[in-house]
Structure formats: C-alpha cells, structure tokens
Amino acid sequence: NSGGPIINNSKLVGIAMSVRKESENIGYIVPPPVIKHFLKDYEDARYDGFPNLGIWHQPIKGKLLPEYFGLNPKEGGVLLTGVEYGSSAFGLLHENDIILSIDNVSIARDGSIGLNENLRVDFEYLIDTHFINEKIKIKIIRNKKRISIELPLKKFVQFTPDEHSV
C-alpha cells in the first residue's frame, strides 16, 4: 500500500512507502515531521528538499582528545573530520573544528541531542528541521578559540552516486 496512510490508535503515524522493487515484504514509513516539512516546502509550488551541512564528524572520546581541542571536562561536541566541497559548511567550518551547539542546542560528545526527556537523536536532526536558505547559529571551537558562526543552509549537490547497480 505505497502512498497510503498508516494509522495507530486513530492517529496518523506516517505514510507507507516502497523504496525498491527488489525490497519485497519490507515496509517503509515516511514520518509526520518529514511530511510536514515537504508540505511547507512545497507551498511555493517548488520542492527544494532538505538542507545538508556536508560534513563528516566523529564522537569525542577519552580524556586526551577533549583536552587537546580545548573542551571543558563536562562540555560536549563533535569533531569535524571533513567538509564537502560546495556544501553549506564549506568555507565556514573546517576540519578539526569542534561543533558545540546548533541554534543553542548543546551537542553531546557522542553526537546526540536531547529531543525530550527520554529520547536522544543525532544532532543533524536540527538541520532537518530547517529549510534551504535559512540560517543556523553554530558555536564551535577552532584552535582552542570559541567562535559563533551564522551559517546559511544550501541544497546539497552530490557529485558522486550513493550506490551502483550493475
């Protein structure tokens, strides 16, 4: 039932979606936040999609790494290991920057943020709540100095495919 609503206890929990012909008996759900984002984005009769920072990152573990980059003992953040050419972050964020927060939401050392009292999600969820051309505020540590950056979000243009089929 691709395209049909998925209802639980009289509430919409998503829309059924099929991804691949080869994926028989596998059900995928488009959740309400994605549906709402799409509908709001399409109000101008043009779908722009989700923004993407275009970064690679890793968790900050151990005692030496946080100290080396200038993190306080109880402070979180993620270490940037790369920035995609032409992405939203290109030219503004750099390899070895530590992202501390986005829009004043602190990032844990494992890269998660608290969505509510009982649920943590990847910090990039914060980007998914925005639209192309909106700006976000990022606090970083670069060379042991704290910097605040206003970063405009762009549509991500991928130069290579995600997968190959033969």
Language-model region placement:
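Active-site loop architecture of trypsin-fold serine endopeptidases
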Residues: 1-3, 7-36, 105-114
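C-terminal, low-ordered peptide segments at domain boundaries
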Residues: 110, 125, 130, 137-166
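PDZ/PDZ-like domain segments forming the peptide/carboxylate-binding groove
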Residues: 1-5, 57-101, 105-107
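PDZ domains, with a preference for the canonical peptide-binding region formed by the helix
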Residues: 90, 101-139
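Solvent-exposed coil/turn segments that connect beta secondary-structure elements
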Residues: 11, 18-20, 33-35, 58-61, ...
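Extracytoplasmic
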Residues: 23-25, 50-52, 74-78, 94-95, ...
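PDZ/PDZ-like peptide-tail recognition elements
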Residues: 36-78, 82, 156-166
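Terminal peptide-recognition signature
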Residues: 3-6, 10, 15, 30-31, ...
